[in-house]
UniProtKB/Swiss-Prot annotation:
Cofactor: FAD
Pathway noted in the entry: Antibiotic biosynthesis
Lineage start: Bacteria, Bacillati, Actinomycetota, Actinomycetes, Kitasatosporales
Gene (name only): frbG
Organism: Streptomyces rubellomurinus (strain ATCC 31215)
InterPro entries cross-referenced by the UniProt entry: FAD/NAD-bd_sf
Function, in words: Hydroxylase involved in the biosynthesis of the phosphonate antibiotic FR-900098, a potent antimalarial agent that acts as an inhibitor of 1-deoxy-D-xylulose 5-phosphate reductoisomerase (DXR), the first enzyme in the nonmevalonate pathway for isoprenoid biosynthesis. Catalyzes the N-hydroxylation of CMP-5'-3-aminopropylphosphonate (CMP-5'-3APn) to CMP-5'-(N-hydroxy-3-aminopropyl)phosphonate (CMP-5'-H3APn). Cannot use CMP-5'-N-acetyl-3-aminopropylphosphonate (CMP-5'-Ac3APn) as a substrate.
EC number: 1.14.13.-
Protein keywords: Antibiotic biosynthesis, FAD, Flavoprotein, Monooxygenase, NADP, Oxidoreductase
GO biological process, one term: antibiotic biosynthetic process
Name under which the protein is recorded: CMP-5'-(3-aminopropyl)phosphonate hydroxylase
Catalysed reactions, as listed in the record: CMP-5'-(3-aminopropyl)phosphonate + NADPH + O2 = CMP-5'-(N-hydroxy-3-aminopropyl)phosphonate + NADP(+) + H2O
Length: 437
């Protein structure tokens, strides 16, 4: 058993970004000298599931390359700017790149992080190891791992939980299951299944081409991103015949604009609480971007280009019961759920061995503005720090953002910069720096 200042559980975009953020801040040596262990269940760090997503990013290609500037670009990530992966991504600098292109670059970043950790005498990276349990205590936390050679444990002053998200596929109280009972033969897929399944690729000879009506449940980016993918297929003549695609949501989607003047010129209705004070952007964090934004603007009549025939939206602002959903989805052959994510977590125990119940005031884990998760019984979970898909931080004066946004901050750029700075401060606040091995 080895002791580290920080144990990072999960080596996807969020987990790796903790190390990248330290480099961006010019504090990598300070961070690593305290001792850092990275644990990743797969054999690859940095990109998570991103290489398998058949859709476009919601950030410009240039945003993913900003980590190559400044201290990180001359140190941890030196030379990556000349890689084939970076050059391909640079070709999308002013566009929204395909996520497999982003994933290839993030995999390179992950390789650099793993190499840096393995070369440092007080750090390590364990790939192919699964985090089973984290037991917290007043002085340290113990992390139980399962790997090729069995179980092993390490301890940390802080445990950073960045294990990705688990997609929600049901509505309370079991409304989707009840809908399927009312509509025998109705198929239900998650958005993740659609965007990772090769049978939804433009070149695929797929039975999905025969679909005539599809409903997408959810009004955030994942829902409109799936709808935008379907729109691309429809415009290419992929479907065997006319197809209707309806996004069912609780409210009209928030649209990102660079300024209030731009939003006003298009006739988009917004509130002062939707404007980020420091940047002046409308729906800076909560707004749709990329192909999802363009389709939503077309459906809402804000864009010059029209949406494909049959594409529309239904606002279902009351309870999402089976009866209400049945009316909203009409005669759909397929329902695609895009209902958000919950944080993927290991078993969490307190010092007394009892399971820790984290606070979830709005459904997602409450990590506040500083990444320190709250407990359902009150107070904070000792020794734990969290962020990432399903557990993002809420906006603060430090991160900026629109005051009216009640969601979570997610995305590679904010992981490496604004959120990364907040998380790094939480990890370095620990006063234990001696070698506890």
């Amino acid at each position: 058993m080895t002791h580290y200042a920080t144990v990072i559980c999960g080596g996807g975009p969020a987990g790796v970004s903790a190390v990248v953020a330290a480099a961006v801040q010019g504090r990598l040596e300070e961070f690593l000298d305290r001792g850092v262990l990275l644990v990743e269940a797969t054999g690859r760090a940095g990109s998570g599931s991103i290489p398998h997503y058949g859709i476009r990013a919601n950030s410009l290609g240039s945003a993913f390359l900003e980590c190559l500037d400044g201290p990180a670009g001359s140190g941890l990530l030196a030379g990556l700017a000349d890689s084939a992966e970076a050059r391909e991504l640079r070709g999308w600098a002013d566009e929204y790149p395909p996520l497999p292109v982003v994933g290839a670059f993030l995999t390179l970043v992950g390789e650099r992080v793993v190499d840096a950790l393995r070369r440092h005498p007080r750090c390590d990276a364990l790939l192919g190891h699964r985090v089973v349990e984290v037991r917290t205590g007043p002085e340290r936390a113990t992390v139980l791992l399962s790997g090729p050679d069995g179980e092993l444990s390490h301890t940390g002053d802080r445990v950073l939980l960045t294990m990705g998200g688990r997609e929600r596929t049901e509505l309370a109280p079991d409304a989707l299951a009840a809908l399927v009972e009312r509509r025998p033969g109705l198929r239900v897929l998650s958005s993740g299944e659609v965007i990772t399944d090769p049978s939804w690729h433009p070149d695929a000879a797929s039975p999905h081409r025969a679909l005539g009506s599809i409903a997408v449940l959810g009004g955030a980016h994942s829902a409109w991103a799936v709808a935008a993918h379907l729109a691309r297929l429809a415009r290419a003549g992929w479907f065997a015949g006319p197809v209707e695609v309806t996004v069912v949501e609780r409210r009209l989607p928030p649209i990102f604009y660079f300024s209030a003047a731009e939003a006003r010129a298009e006739g988009y209705r917004w509130d002062e609480a939707d404007v980020c004070g420091p940047s002046g952007r409308v729906h800076r964090f909560g707004g749709l971007r990329g192909p999802a934004r363009e389709l939503a603007r077309q459906v809402m009549g804000l864009a010059a280009e029209k949406a494909p025939d049959g594409f529309g939206q239904v606002v279902l602002d009351g309870p999402w019961t089976a009866e209400a959903l049945e009316a909203a989805v009409g005669d759909a052959d397929l329902v695609i759920t895009a209902l958000g994510y919950d944080a993927r977590l290991p078993r969490l125990l307190g010092a007394d061995g009892r399971e820790l119940e984290l606070a979830r005031p709005r459904g997602a884990v409450d990590t506040g503005r500083d990444g320190l998760p709250g407990l359902a019984a009150g107070g904070r979970a000792e020794r734990l720090v969290m962020y990432g898909l399903g557990a993002g931080l809420v906006p603060s004066e430090e991160t900026g953002g629109e005051p009216g946004y009640r969601g979570r901050l997610d995305g590679v750029w904010v992981y490496q910069h604004d959120i990364g700075a907040v998380i790094l401060r939480a990890l370095l606040a620990n006063d234990r720096t001696e070698d506890g091995r």
